[in-house]
């Protein structure tokens, strides 16, 4: 199965939102009847603002003319430092592959494409929240678990 990665801009907003809802339902184990109307409206506003400003890059993995996965990276700035002189950070989000295509390298292609985008932007740090299912993929690609981070 040949997989290509396509940039997904605002012209694909409907697809982006549909895939975002799929990801949210699976990752958060939400039942089909859970009402995500408000959350999806917020996601729409996010994409409508962030994509044109270059604050988010989204992509789809396509095989046999069908979308089989998706991913994105949120861009942000931090104070420049020796380990990130440009101060550019990326946070991988929404990395997802349809269950029937898992284990075929789709997720790896998505993440590699996003890493290439990050390198093009001279991104000094790339972060992500890894699910148990995804941790081995990220480790294979060179990501390391971080100690010392806290969340409120």
State where each predicted segment sits.
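Conserved acetyl-CoA pyrophosphate-binding loop and the N-cap/start of the following alpha-helix
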Residues: 101, 105-113
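Conserved catalytic-core motifs of GNAT/GCN5-like acyltransferases
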Residues: 78-81, 127-129, 133, 139, ...
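Conserved GNAT-fold acetyl-CoA-binding loop/helix
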Residues: 24-46
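Conserved acetyl-CoA binding element of GNAT-fold acetyltransferases
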Residues: 83-99, 148
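Conserved N-terminal entry element of GNAT/NAT acetyltransferase domains
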Residues: 1-14
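Conserved GNAT acetyl-CoA-binding A-motif
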Residues: 118-130
